[in-house]
Curated annotation (Swiss-Prot):
Organism the protein comes from: Helicobacter pylori (strain ATCC 700392 / 26695) (Campylobacter pylori)
GO biological process: regulation of translational fidelity; translation
NCBIfam families reported in the protein's UniProt record: gatC (TIGR00135)
EC class of the enzyme, as a word: ligase
Entry keyword set: ATP-binding, Ligase, Nucleotide-binding, Protein biosynthesis
Residue numbers spanned by region Disordered: 60-80
Superkingdom, taxonomy of origin: Bacteria
General function of this protein: Allows the formation of correctly charged Asn-tRNA(Asn) or Gln-tRNA(Gln) through the transamidation of misacylated Asp-tRNA(Asn) or Glu-tRNA(Gln) in organisms which lack either or both of asparaginyl-tRNA or glutaminyl-tRNA synthetases. The reaction takes place in the presence of glutamine and ATP through an activated phospho-Asp-tRNA(Asn) or phospho-Glu-tRNA(Gln).
Family as reported in the entry's similarity comment: Belongs to the GatC family.
Identification of the protein by name: Glutamyl-tRNA(Gln) amidotransferase subunit C
Keyword presence, Ribosomal protein: no
Length: 93
């Protein structure tokens, strides 16, 4: 992939960055180098590789737990509570 002025301008807009004119050629060179590394990675043949680990996230059993005192403990930490709710200053009239 060739890094030209149009692509660099589009990348500037997408990233919301402004690259000064004196740095544009340097940035183009760095981007071309990075894309070269990515192309090398894509060229690797990995179909014959086998993984030593299982590539999935084990799920835990969903067990409901009753904790009836939790709400009381939380509300006891607040100075202003009423009818099992937090009382906060009114911000909208």
């Amino acid at each position: 992939m060739q890094i030209d002025d149009a692509l660099l301008q589009r990348l500037e807009k997408l990233s919301m960055l402004e690259i000064k004119d004196e740095h544009k050629e340097s940035v183009k060179g760095h981007l071309a180098e990075v894309l070269g590394f990515v192309e090398n990675i894509f060229a690797l043949e990995t179909s014959a590789l086998k993984t030593d680990i299982e590539l999935c996230t084990p799920l835990r059993e969903d067990e409901p737990k009753s904790q009836p005192n939790t709400a009381k403990e939380i509300l006891s930490q607040n100075k202003h509570s009423q009818d099992h709710y937090f009382v906060v200053p009114k911000i909208i009239e």
